[in-house]
């Protein structure tokens, strides 16, 4: 029993092969099978279309939308980062300008303070030097006056001695001093 169906199938295949061999046309290009081939081709394309439409295309569409959203989010994040960087740069420039202005103001204030201290110290030193100069000039005048007084006394004594030695006349030191004083006043004028 098992051999009977096998032999029937084999016989049927052999008959079909003989029919085809007699026609001389390649079976897929045989016009008698076109209707059947078109039917199965249509069914295969419908199944392929449904599979693409229901399974594959939604996944591709979702992937493309996710990628587009991710790119848009990345662009938004980049724009935000750029805006933040620009704001930080502006804040840095502003704080740098403020620090520079504060430094200039502090330098000017310090310069004014130092100039005032220097002027004060200079005035004190000048006053001290002026006082020392006046004291020195007074000491010099005193020494000069003392020296002149001594020179006057010596000149008066010398004059009295010279007149006495040369003229043989005795002159008092007081008279000789008056003569020396007159000569000194005449020379100063």
Swiss-Prot record:
GO function term, MF aspect, one: proton-transporting ATP synthase activity, rotational mechanism
Recorded hits in CDD domains, A to Z, give: ATP-synt_Fo_b
Question: What membrane topology is annotated for this entry?
Answer: Single-pass membrane protein
Question: What Pfam families does the database record attribute to this sequence?
Answer: ATP-synt_B
State which residue ranges cross the membrane. 32-52
Record localization = Cell inner membrane
Q: Which family does it belong to?
A: Belongs to the ATPase B chain family.
Q: What is this protein called?
A: ATP synthase subunit b 1
Q: Name the species this protein comes from.
A: Maricaulis maris (strain MCS10)
Q: Which gene encodes it?
A: atpF1
């Amino acid at each position: 029993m098992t051999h009977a169906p096998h032999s029937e199938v084999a016989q049927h295949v052999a008959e079909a092969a003989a029919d085809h061999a007699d026609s001389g046309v390649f079976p897929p290009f045989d016009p008698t099978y076109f209707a059947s081939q078109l039917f199965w081709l249509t069914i295969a394309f419908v199944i392929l279309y449904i599979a693409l439409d229901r399974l594959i295309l939604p996944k591709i569409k979702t992937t493309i939308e996710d990628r587009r959203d991710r790119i848009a989010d990345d662009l938004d994040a980049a724009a935000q980062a750029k805006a933040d960087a620009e704001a930080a740069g502006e804040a840095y420039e502003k704080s740098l300008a403020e620090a520079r202005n504060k430094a200039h103001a502090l330098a000017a204030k310090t310069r004014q303070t130092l100039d005032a201290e220097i002027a004060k110290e200079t005035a004190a030193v000048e006053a001290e030097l002026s006082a020392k100069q006046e004291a020195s000039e007074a000491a010099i005048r005193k020494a000069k006056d003392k020296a002149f007084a001594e020179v006057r006394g010596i000149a008066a004594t010398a004059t009295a001695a010279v007149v006495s030695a040369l003229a043989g006349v005795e002159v008092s030191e007081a008279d000789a001093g008056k003569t020396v004083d007159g000569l000194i006043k005449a020379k100063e004028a």
